[in-house]
Amino acid sequence: MISINNFINGEFVPPNSNQYLDVYEPATGLIYSNVADSNSNDIENAYQSAQSAFKFWSGISVEERAGYLNKIADGIESRLDEFAEYESRDTGKPISLAKSVDIPRAVSNFRFFAEFGLSFQFESELNSDQSQNKLIRSPLGVVGCISPWNLPLYLFTWKIAPALIAGNTVVAKPSEITPYTAFKLSEICRDAGFPVGVLNIIHGQGRTSGNALVCHRGIKAISFTGGTATGKLITKKTASSFKKLSLEMGGKNPAVIFADCDYDNMLETMVRSSFSNQGQICLCSSRILVEEPIYEKFKIDFVQGVSELKIGDPSKEGTQFGALSSKGHYEKVLSYMEIAKQEGGKVLVGGNQIKINGRCETGWFVEPTIIEGLNNSCRTNQEEIFGPIVTLQSIQSEYEAIQLANETEYGLSATIWTEDKEKANRISSQIDAGIIWVNCWLVRDLRTPFGGMKQSGMGREGGDEALRFFTEPKNICTTQ
């Protein structure tokens, strides 16, 4: 059994407490590793390492930093299948998904920001008859990056890459539930000759090491992806220190389907957008609003499509639907299935746990579940479940679609299905969500801003927005 240690100053270091947490394989429910249970002393050591490396890292050119990021990308890509196996084992997601999405996206994150940093305006000028103004965007210093368990390497690198290309040094904390690919990223950094101290990876629980990172006075910014409740705690804990915050949090995303849509494309995409990664993506559709003329047809076809998903061992190439990522989350999802039934919901398909024969017999599997007949104000339609449970509602008009879509405290994403471009534009402009997909889902141009409205987030990631977040502007004004 491998013990996952912290990565500080280019070396693997056991936690100050000498305590470790069990790491489980969701597909079997069995322990396969353990990970450092770090505390504030480990965070302090990582901070000191990052602080010592900051002068060097911020002092080299963007081109040099880009070269280092590309080396990391090359290292991950050269071991893509290996990383995919680790990600699948850690999370319970199908290995085909890890191979086609998670690990390639991690590679893309480093390569994108390596290239994007070369064109970003870290220096510019604004001149007039009265003055010359030199505008400089400088790195903040040591920053903290906290990533979730559902897309471990995908979102870990999404935060680290822009922080690094901007010239910051980083103390990063992955989820203790799914730490393995972050650990392997440490190996890539070491083997690629990445400058010591520039990236430090600390493992452990949110209430201990995560809290210490958030509260550390030397950390200039926190980039966080996770639940809204945790995001609120981070906001409170950092209020007095005025840290910069980027918070990407929960969602309860509507999909609005009109009768004039490209039906076949919509149907195939809705199965994927509802149940990809077992519904454990913040952008998954969870409230499906269908125009009345096609509601019954869609219901029948959607249930059929979901019923055909291949559920099973995530390590098998043919599996389309794997295990939930932790026992606690498995129990939470099962509890919401019961809540939906108690609220009067009619289960069209699913609604139960699953026993998989063979090595996965004790794994954390539930059925993909579709429910209709619920009021929009009920808990099932208002609270983020973050699992394979979706609800169906019939709509009569654009007005009703917009009203129901916005009737939630979240505002992360939405999808709209119609061949009428004017209708799509009308509705998009009135739905409160940070990203809206029209006739598609999860299509991402990494130059565009990403983040949510309302309780779904604060700040934006991606492209210019990410590099603005990880830099501080300064104006140097000289008179003629």
What are these regions (language model features)?
Residues 28-34, 219, 256, 310, ...:
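Conserved C-terminal structural/oligomerization subdomain of aldehyde/semialdehyde dehydrogenase
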Residues 1-27:
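Hydrophobic face of amphipathic alpha-helices that form TPR/SEL1-like repeat modules
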